[in-house]
Each structure stands twice: as structure tokens, then as C-alpha cells.
């Protein structure tokens, strides 16, 4: 059959990334406590396309991923990138993979266990000049406004916030380690299941520990900077303000801290 993708293209324009996006696929990932966890990932995979090829072979991306989906870890992702480059005759390959990750969490007072969902994943690139690998977590937390507490006779506005941490490491850093740093740096963590004694504890703890998004970002940055396994990091904190129709945002990475 005629291979249309391999036809010669005369426009002389190379493409940086071609591939597939938003592929949903069952995967197994490493879990610090239970060794392995089954989940469903959202996956983007790309390669470069030379100027003289009309198109890439999209089906081959899934053929490659299908070999490795039962064990997603840093070593496997490196193999996926190598296989993509070899199979598609490319100079570079990139993968972005994110998935729900569940941890058992005890309520602070009653100690009742329930599962808490986090968004975790990896982003990796392998090219002629450089290789990059990032571990990513997104963690929902609570912030309570220090200014609101200071100027109010009682109470203060509080809300959920989303923390996103990306790290480049010299050795394995568990998702759980990054999740703990994010939750420890907030006014208070979130919980799936709270009874009345737990709710009282969480409400009072947040009030006693007010944080701006700037405070959360800086406190996380200090913890990451002090971790010898982490070579580079980026932190983003977005607070879904309960008394405004806009969000508050703060961002820091290790590069700016070196200046």
C-alpha cells in the first residue's frame, strides 16, 4: 500500500513536535507504600519531523507505548523515548504523562482512613544536545488570608489552592515526598473524609496558620532547595479566592534563587 506519510515534502520546513495528544491509557506506576498502583494516564508523545517528510506515522506512537504501559517509571520512560526515536527515525522525542495518584490519609483527630487523590506524572525529552526529565505533582491545599485575619474582628477568608511542583533530580524522589512538602507548607492540608472533631481541628489550624500564596511558594522552595537529591525545581501556587472573582498566583524556580 502507498505510504503517504513518507512522501517527500517540498516546503522545506522541519517541525519541532509532531505526535499524539490526550491519549488515555491504563498504566501501572511505582507506589512507595504498596510498590505498584494501577491508574489511568493522560499522555502526550512527540518526535521531530525532518523537512523532507510529509508526515509522521501516528499509529507507531501507540505501538511503542503499548510495550511499556504496565510499568511507568523513570527507566521505562527513557526506553520509551529511545524506542520512539528509533521507530520513527527521529532525532528527538518527548513525552508528557499525568495520572491520578491515590494515597490513604488519616483524618487528623478521629484517624479514620480514606483515599486522597493527587495528580502526578513525568515530563521527559531526549534530543541531540540535551536530555531532560521532570517529576511533577499537583496538590490541593487550603490557604487562609493573613490580611483578612489581621483586619477582621473574627474569622478570615479561606479557600482551596493548587500547588504544582516540578523537579529535576539526581536520584529517585517519590511523589509522596513532594506531596508532603506541599501539604506541610500550606495553612492546612485537605482531607477526603472529616468528622466533626476533624473539621474543628482543620478549621482552627488554618486560622492559626495563615498563608499568602507567596508564603506557600517560598516555604516549598526552601524545602526543595535543601534537598540534595533535587537539582532544579519550579513551584506554582494558585489560590481560588473565595471573596474575589479572580485567583491569586505565585511562582518561583531554583534559577531565580541562585541570582
Swiss-Prot record:
GO terms for biological process, alphabetical: tetrahydrofolate biosynthetic process
Site entry: May be catalytically important: 145
A Pfam entry, by short name: GCHY-1
Keywords for the protein's UniProt record, in alphabetical order: Hydrolase
Pathway: Cofactor biosynthesis; 7,8-dihydroneopterin triphosphate biosynthesis; 7,8-dihydroneopterin triphosphate from GTP: step 1/1
Listed EC numbers: 3.5.4.16
Keyword Ion transport: no
GO-annotated molecular function: GTP cyclohydrolase I activity
Keyword Flavoprotein: no
Catalytic activity: GTP + H2O = 7,8-dihydroneopterin 3'-triphosphate + formate + H(+)
Family: Belongs to the GTP cyclohydrolase IV family.
Function recorded in the entry: Converts GTP to 7,8-dihydroneopterin triphosphate.
Protein name: GTP cyclohydrolase FolE2
Taxonomic source organism: Thermosipho melanesiensis (strain DSM 12029 / CIP 104789 / BI429)
